[in-house]
Structures are given as structure tokens and as C-alpha cells.
Amino acid sequence: MAAIRLDRSHALYREALSVLPAGVSSNARVWRSAGPRMMPFSLFVSKARGSHLWDVDGNEYIDYRMGFGPVILGHSDPRIHERVHAMDEQGLVYALSHELEVTVAKKIASMVPCADMVRFANSGTEATMHAIRVARAYTKREAVVKFEGMYHGAHDYLLFSTDPPFDRARGAPKAIPMSAGIPRALQNLCLVERWNDFDRIEKLVKAKGDRIAAIITEPIMGNCAAITPRDGYLKHLRQLASDHGIVLIFDEVKTGFRVAPGGAQARFGVTPDLATFAKSMGNGYPVACFAGSTEIMNTIGPSKVVHGGTYSGNPVSLAAVDATLDILKTGEAHAKLESFGSRLMRALAEVADEEGTRMLVNGVPEMFQILFTRQREVHEYRDLAKCDLAKYAALHVELLNHGVMIDEDNMECFFTCEDHSDEDLERTVAAFHTALADVNAGRVHMPEAASGA
């Protein structure tokens, strides 16, 4: 199998380096293992339709990144575009109230167990940042518990120990800053614990509960290979939070509206006090929200907790949400995701068995990941230290050559969408079989680009 050519992407990346720091608009777009002739690298996209994506060199891929998860129906879904384009004609942003805010908030409240009240935002980072502020105001406490390996946005409150080097993730977890520029004072307000460990979180809460405003957790570790909670773990967090007057926050930026119409809280039957959403709620449009009980959400308002934003609740984004939720609330799209994802997970595991490769398929059909490991289960970030990340990186390259797009980062997930087809499944499994055989044989065909590109 010949390697794909990425001449135009290569040239654009070199050009971008002169005007965009690191050549990108988000650090996560820098690939470290797939660039032709130069490292790092970023793939440049020309278009996306349905379950497929095309780069600027004309290479077509079956897409399992889905923009890090927002695209739950398919790229450029005409049902969403029709509603959005109709709203375009009424104006893009008012920075005033409009009826669709009420309509969509009521729709979210009807679907999400914790959502008595809703506030709209523009990104998952905004949503989690404001949820933390609300929790601190409500409890009149300042410390926040987060879990090692979880990412809750790029704000300073929680950008600790999202993916610490494995040689530093030993012993008792520490709040390790993941960026330069984070004030040291915030480190003392972020208490980091290991996920899925009943005893450790109970000891922490009993020792420091009177300082803790919130426990924030993803119900499924969306930036940690789709690790799922142990049976009863989310209920344990719920009980601990209730017993100690702590606000339990579910970060559903990735799981929300994806793993069930009512999010992971509906799937697992555990209701938090607050929850944050983004990504799938708009099928790719930039929109987010945070929601929770009336008592807690009513801390927001003039002369109380500040929340605002010129673009928050703008009519165009909410038109996308309105249309997307109308489709998702029936459950039919989720049935397709569940069926497709289950079959794909099973087929990939069968290929690995045929190739004699120890591989774990981890997660749920709507979002999952493959891990090259001898472990039968993974329960926390530190378990990923026992996975062959280099082998996954090589597989990523070979799958690109075969027209299948997974994320370069083994901590990320495969995301399925309603538009993924039986043909996509067959092509993916065939590509995976060939790619895995090549990787096992030490054959990795790096993408190529002209030296002068």
C-alpha cells in the first residue's frame, strides 16, 4: 500500500507557521506522528459531508473523529442547515432575548434529568468555568475536586493533571499545571484524585469536605480512551456530595446528548446538581450550556453570580440546537449509533484476535477507543501507561493511508454518527485488517510530500 500524499497540507502548514502560533488555532490540531518529512504537522481539510471528510490534497476519509465528537448526525446535515439558514435571514446576533432561547431551554429541560434551568454559552470551556463559579457561590467554598486524566476545558480553574507524564503520575495525585501561565494560587484550590477508586474519594471528601465546593467528573472519560465508571461509582459520588453539601457536576461536554438523548446521567441513572454540555447538542455548531437545579441556578443574576456573553444563546446556534434535539429526542438516531458502534467494536476485536494482537476495545458504541494492552479492563488514567501508545500511533498512520480517519491521540475516542453506513463499516474493517497486519510486520508508510512543498 502506497502512502498518501499530503503536498498541499504540508505547504499550508509551513505557511501557517508564520502567522499562527505552532501553525494552528488549537494546540490539539498539531499531529506528532503523521507528518511528512517534518514534525510536527497539521492536516488541512477542504470539506466534510455525512460520515466522510476530504483533505486539501483530495484524500477522502471515513471520519471517526467527528470534530472531537460534536458531529453526531453527520457533517453538513441538511436537516440542520435548513433550520439554520432560515434563521440567518432573521439576523445572526442580537445580544437581546429571543423566543428560541425559551423554546430550546424547555426542550433541554424535558430531556436532561438535572436540567430545571439552563444558561447558554459558546464552548465547553465556558460552560465548565461558569459551573465552577456557580458551585463556589452556592456553597461559599472554594476548593474543587477533579480526577486525574480528565480535561474540563482550557480555563485556569481545572487545567491540572489532564495528561501528566506517566512518570509523574505516581503515588498520591497532585495538581500538576498543564500550561504555562496558570497562577500558583489556583493549584491549591484544585484537589486531584484517581477516578473509579471508591475509597480514595471517600477519604478525601471526609477529610476536606468543608472546603470543597464541587466534585466535577466526566461520566465517561472522554479524553482518556472512553474509560467507563465502575458499577456504582457515580452513585457513590452522588451520595458523598449530598452527605457533605458539595455540588456534584457532570461534565457532559462529550457525553451529553451523545450516549443517550438525556446524556450519560440518563444512561447511568445518576442525577448531578449541575451539568455542562456542548459538542453534540448542535451537531457541530459552536454552542454550549450548563444546567441544573432551580435552587443552584438561581444564584445567577444581576448583583449575584455573573454569567454573560455577547454570543451566548445567539439565534443561529440555537436554531442548530433546536433542530438537532428534535432529531435526537426520538431515540432513532441513537439506535443507529448503538447498532453501528456495537458492530464496529465487535469487528475490530475480531480482527485483532485473527492477527494475534492483544487489544482491548474500550467504551460504549457512541464513543470508544482501542488499546494495545494485555489488560482486560482499564479503570483510570494510570492504566494507560501499560498500553502500547507507539503501536497505536503507527496504526493511525496506516489507517490514513487506507482512507480511515481516527484521532492521532490514543487518549481520544472513535466517535460514531447517524450517517455512518454499512459500507463504511465494511471498508473500515477491511482497512483495519490490512493496517494492523502492516503495523505488526513493522511496515509503516509515512505520508509523503514534495520536498519543496
What positions do the PLM features span?
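Conserved N-terminal phosphate-binding loop of PLP-dependent enzymes in the Aspartate aminotransferase
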Residues: 1-453
